[in-house]
Amino acid sequence: LIGVNHVAGHIYACRLAAGRDIYPCLGLVVSGGHTALFRCDDALTMTLLGGTRDDAAGEAFDKVAAILGLGFPGGPALEREAATGDPKAFKFPRAFSDDGRLEFSFSGLKTAVLYACHGQNVSKATPPPAGKLRADLAASFQAAVVDALALKCKQALRHTGLKRLAVGGGVSANKALRAGLAAACEREGAELIIPPAELCTDNAAMAALAVEKFRRGEFAPADLDAVPNFL
């Protein structure tokens, strides 16, 4: 019996996509359940550098998509809507942008979108925005998430001295995020590795991490159980 760390599996999918060793690297896992940065010395040795204080990025995408009256899953729906919007139409907050903490927060951003849609009295039932307003809100929200993630990746690359960023999780399929991280890595002289979209969400390639444990003779006891919040 071999236990596989779901989060480590997302980074390992980058190794399979690259077809070569990618370690050591900075790992960013950005999904509906996780938003965290890791120092990855090898496939099985990961040190948490920082995570989110509240919502994960993917969770924020889903919640804001609901506020805007878009479909589920929220990530793809919001990305499609943002494609025709102005990312500078609304100045939404980027948490922790003025300090070096490798932490994320998306709850305040979500609330800012809510107030931009409905004003301060959000208890009243009002229809979701439509047309250009909705597209601009989606684009401005997406830009804020991308900026926050890219900034902390740049800070983490400088902090660790690593020259490779591996990114996994469903949100990493977002084209705007890929472009933002590519620009950040170029400025830092670092290599960016992101799997194709089909390997960003949960997939069987992640379970291939079990091969690394098998090679090392690392097996789990028969009473192994799932740990939903394990990082």
Predicted feature residues:
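Conserved phosphate-binding/catalytic loops in two-lobed NTP-binding clefts
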Residues: 3, 165, 181-207
